Swiss-Prot record:
Family the UniProt entry places it in: Belongs to the DTD family.
Record's protein name: D-aminoacyl-tRNA deacylase
Subunit structure: Homodimer.
Gene transcribed to yield this protein: dtd
Enzymatic reactions: glycyl-tRNA(Ala) + H2O = tRNA(Ala) + glycine + H(+); a D-aminoacyl-tRNA + H2O = a tRNA + a D-alpha-amino acid + H(+)
Biological source species: Thermoanaerobacter sp. (strain X514)
InterPro entries assigned to the protein according to its UniProt record, in alphabetical order: Daa-tRNA_deacyls_DTD (IPR003732), DTD-like_sf (IPR023509)
Length: 149
């Protein structure tokens, strides 16, 4: 499982010109689910997202998590994060999970983040979306449940 976590002032998702989800301060998380992901990857990712300390404390140090600031998550499924561009010029998406299975793990990730005390809004699975991301910093973190960046 791969995620791009962006610290935001606000974020929103629109489908067909209509805003379907929005958040204030927190994270917009673009998540790609791989063919070899399982529940352990979901638990790892949920824990990382909720406890990632990238919000400033009173001294200006990145020391606070979503839980500490009462932040929200806007979780958007993005299979293109699994695109392999090492060969050729067109991405190979063979590592992206099939939609039915990906949706199962996506929903589990939503539930696991919420269980840990953070409000989650989502995009629309398998839809063409417009994602508004008002970065704060910017602070962008890459997380992969199987690789170290």
């Amino acid at each position: 499982m791969r995620a791009v976590v962006q610290r935001v002032i606000r974020g929103e998702v629109s489908v067909d010109g209509e805003v379907i989800s929005s958040i204030g301060k927190g994270f917009v998380v673009l998540v790609g689910i791989s063919v070899d992901d399982n529940e352990n990857d979901v638990m790892y990712m949920a824990d990382k997202i909720v406890n990632l300390r990238v919000f400033e404390d009173e001294e200006g140090k990145m020391n606070l998590s979503l839980l500490d600031i009462g932040g929200e998550v806007l979780l958007v499924s993005q299979f293109t994060l699994l695109g392999d561009v090492r060969k050729g010029r067109r991405p190979n998406f063979m590592m992206a999970q099939k939609p039915e299975e990906a949706l199962k793990y996506f929903n589990l990730l939503v539930n696991e983040i919420e269980k840990r005390g953070v409000s989650v809004k989502t995009g629309k699975f398998q839809a063409m979306m417009k994602v508004l991301i008002e970065n704060d910093g910017p602070v962008t973190i890459l997380i992969d449940s199987k690789k170290i960046f």
